[in-house]
């Protein structure tokens, strides 16, 4: 398995993220993962499907919330740079990466949870 250069992944994602959503979170996070040196061959199309895909490329589930994700206080997650959050909400879900200051996907987010309603959220950390 390839080694993960978290710094390169985060540099690419932070540099290329927009100020508002482009509806392309999975593409942006996937490209960041690739910029960090990990192949995403066989990747899924929708963001929510990365819950099953990330463990195949060296990421471990470190935190999961079901149900009241929107109402959850996310401050105790202790996210580290490079952690990836996958939300199973809506048609395609959402995926984003913590850059050490904020959650980023195809845009620079104000919060991790970007939806108005509740759903499921899984957070992954690279352990390859």
Say what each PLM segment does.
Residues 43-117:
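...with weaker cross-activation on analogous glycine-rich loops/strands in unrelated enzymes
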Residues 1-17, 64, 69-74, 116-128:
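Non-catalytic ligand/cofactor/substrate-binding and regulatory segments of enzyme domains
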Residues 1-56:
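N-terminal capping segments
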